[in-house]
Regions:
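A polyanion-binding, active-site-adjacent surface
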Residues: 1-219, 245-251, 261-270
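Asp/Glu-rich intrinsically disordered low-complexity tracts
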Residues: 215, 220, 225, 231, ...
């Protein structure tokens, strides 16, 4: 199990990797910034939405518009705050005009989400809306049928409690759905109290037995074989010397100060 500092460091590395992503040509050209996600790197509860909107694209943080205000309110009503959860989206870049994500975009971006989940190791994932729910369930059943129903699912290599609810932005368009969303949220504390579901046994790599080396006395080698052995020894010595020099150079390079990029914590990410 990774320590809190190790998780933050791993998320930092993934954050910088995602910032340079250009897998989706259109999104890379039209985005203002990559909205990686924000919150507690050691959260038991993780929210997964659809994609950044205009406000999120400008600020680089998820759920900072009206939908974000509703999310904050709902969290407060169950005794939680943003610094206790982690919030991410299926897409890290804003689709132009807030259109729906394209299947190819989801395919391109899902690796980042699954790696986030693997690093954070939440016990409960609350999917906000159809896109997140369908992706993490590997199923096309819609949110109208699934909202408020918890189930244990495999997400990547881990078993989690998956809890689909309406997306806050969609609920704002239909006021009656806000009440439904509020009612569903009230089940989250109980789900968290259950703890992590039983995990599958870890995969064990089959061991490969190496054949024992057979030592041969120099006198047992034929003249040609002895010469070849001498050449091999000379080459090995030269290679080892070259490698030692390369390692020294690499160590010196590693000692160079890192570029002055902002740490994600300075951006309020995690």
């Amino acid at each position: 199990v990774a320590s809190p500092d190790e998780r933050r460091e791993s998320l930092k590395e993934l954050f910088h990797e995602a910032r340079g992503c250009v897998r989706c040509t259109q999104l890379a050209q039209t985005r203002h910034t990559v909205v990686f996600g924000a919150g507690n790197a050691n959260a038991d509860l993780m929210f997964v939405g659809e994609a950044p909107g205009r406000n999120e694209d400008e600020r680089g943080l998820p759920f900072v518009g009206q939908a974000g205000k509703l999310l904050d309110t709902l969290l407060g009503e169950i005794g939680l705050a943003r610094d206790q959860v982690f919030i991410a989206n299926v897409l890290k870049c804003r689709p132009p005009g807030n259109r729906d994500p394209h299947p190819a975009e989801i395919e391109n971006c899902q690796e980042y989400l699954f790696r986030q989940i693997e690093l954070i190791e939440p016990t409960v994932i609350c999917t906000l809306g159809n896109f997140a729910t369908k992706l993490l369930r590997h199923d096309t059943t819609g949110i109208m049928r699934l909202h408020g129903r918890a189930e244990v699912r495999m997400v990547g290599p881990r078993s989690v409690r998956l809890f689909p609810v309406f997306h806050p932005a969609a609920a704002l368009y239909t006021p009656s759905n806000v009440d439904v969303l509020r009612q569903d949220f009230r089940a989250l504390p109980e789900l968290l109290a259950l703890g992590a579901p039983e995990q599958p046994p870890p995969l064990v790599e089959p061991s490969v037995e190496e054949e024992p080396l057979v030592e041969v006395e120099a006198g047992e080698l034929a003249p040609g074989e002895a010469a070849a052995a001498g050449d091999a020894a000379a080459v090995g010595t030269a290679t080892a010397s070259a490698d030692a020099g390369s390692l020294g150079a690499a160590d010196e390079a590693a000692a160079e100060p890192a570029s002055a990029e902002p740490h994600p914590a300075q951006l309020g990410l995690f």
